[in-house]
Curated annotation (Swiss-Prot):
Pathway: Phospholipid metabolism; phosphatidylethanolamine biosynthesis; phosphatidylethanolamine from CDP-diacylglycerol: step 2/2. The gene is psd. The modification Pyruvic acid (Ser) is found at residue 254. The active site is at residues 90, 147, 254. This is Phosphatidylserine decarboxylase proenzyme. The record marks 253-254 as: Cleavage (non-hydrolytic). Heterodimer of a large membrane-associated beta subunit and a small pyruvoyl-containing alpha subunit. InterPro entries: PS_Dcarbxylase, PSD-B, PSD_type1_pro. Binds 1 pyruvoyl group covalently per subunit.
Length: 322
């Protein structure tokens, strides 16, 4: 009965209005009130503040500052084996496995369309048919920055407007086509393991979705699909990210979906639905063997990533193929 009531609220409540209100409140500096809200949040969700660079909740000026808090460098060691792709986010695996032609598993008894997830882009969908997917759910207590599973060259980004359903276990089990209905940002990369898509899915109360190369993608929510492209390789204007480097963030929790081309990676055998994920830990192995360079570049430190994020031009300065 309680679950039925919660599901009914998902359809009845003004999710966009609530999300805008939450985003507005989370960005305000309110002194002692901000600290009180953060303290209550930490206690209720059992957030481990010992992992944060700033464990003192009084050091955060806004709730958003707290929510995208950086972690200490030593708490998420990166697996540097060049044949291993690593987990992109802290959270729990919702589902993972093979993409069956155009079908991706959402929950037991529920599939959704690969092409619908990619906003009808059949050319992009063709890259991943019969490939591999991993869906990672970030709960409110988790670290909410998203990192790269491997080195990648950004080729395309698509903003897809949509609903703002919650993306927790209950809704994943009961709301059809959940991830293909919700607002999302699709990022396509060229990698040593073939094309890879990393998709940031919005949800109720998710105030914004950001990337390190473009800043805030949403809001504003204009209600139209927008597309940007970048050059390949080392051409001027290209965006290259390293394995383990931050690529985006959520302000309040949501979901990350990774898509891999067929025959390119094998998921770690011990992973299953509800497996806990930690950034930098093994997610998949290559079907080919790569040899590490003599000196492998390390991910940028948090301070340099922040400076790069702040200095990056807005997406409006990129090639917009809307």
């Amino acid at each position: 009965m309680l679950n039925s009531f919660k599901l009914s609220l998902q359809y009845i409540l003004p999710k966009l209005w609530l999300t805008r209100l939450a985003g507005w409140g989370a960005s305000k500096r309110a002194g002692w009130l901000t600290k009180l809200v953060i303290d209550l949040f930490v206690k209720y969700y059992k957030v481990d503040m010992t992992e944060a660079q700033k464990p003192d909740t009084a050091s955060y000026r806004t709730f958003n500052d707290f929510f995208v808090r950086p972690l200490r460098d030593d708490v998420r060691p990166l697996n540097t084996d060049p044949n291993i792709l690593v987990m992109p986010a802290d959270g729990v695996i919702s589902q993972l496995g093979r993409i069956e032609e155009d079908k991706i598993l959402q929950a037991k008894g529920h599939n959704y369309s690969l092409e619908a997830l990619l906003a009808g882009n059949y050319l992009m969908a063709d890259k991943f048919r019969n490939g591999t997917f991993v869906t990672t759910y970030l709960s409110p207590r988790d670290y909410h920055r998203v990192h790269m599973p491997c080195n990648g060259i950004l080729r395309e980004m698509i903003y897809v407007p949509g609903d703002l359903f919650s993306v927790n276990y209950l809704t994943a089990q009961n709301v059809p086509n959940l991830f293909a209905r919700n607002e999302r940002v699709i990022c396509l990369f060229d990698t040593e393991f073939g094309p890879m898509a990393q998709i940031l899915v919005g949800a109720t109360i998710v105030g914004s979705i950001e990337t390190v190369w473009a800043g805030t993608i949403t809001p504003p929510r204009e209600g139209i699909i927008k597309r940007w492209t970048w050059p390949e390789g080392e051409h001027e204007g290209s965006v290259a990210l390293l394995k383990g480097q931050e690529m985006g963030r959520f302000k309040l929790g949501s979901t990350v979906i990774n898509l891999f081309a067929p025959g390119k990676v094998n998921l770690i055998a011990s992973l299953a639905s509800l497996s806990v994920t930690k950034i930098g830990q093994p997610l998949a192995t290559s079907t080919e063997t790569f040899v590490a360079p003599e000196v492998e570049p390390a991910p940028l430190p948090a301070e340099e990533i922040k400076a790069e994020h702040d200095a990056s031009p807005l997406v409006d300065n990129k090639k917009d193929d809307t």
